[in-house]
């Protein structure tokens, strides 16, 4: 479930989709320096997609 993540994980964005007029939430947390773990979830807490990304500032 998406909402059972650690406390440092937070909603960083949300997307209004045309699919059933639902809302998707993007959660992000920093695992290491500049290394982020993102999760895309539905309003019901179902994880649709997750990925790691290194952010270069």
From Swiss-Prot:
Keywords from the named record: Nucleus
Location within or outside the cell: Nucleus
Free-text tissue specificity from the UniProt record: Mesophyll protoplasts.
Any one of the GO CC terms: nucleus
Superkingdom assignment: Eukaryota
Main location: nucleus
Motif (Nuclear localization signal): 6-10
Biological role: Stress response. May play a role in the reentering of protoplasts into the cell cycle.
Protein name, entry field: Stress response protein
Source species: Nicotiana sylvestris
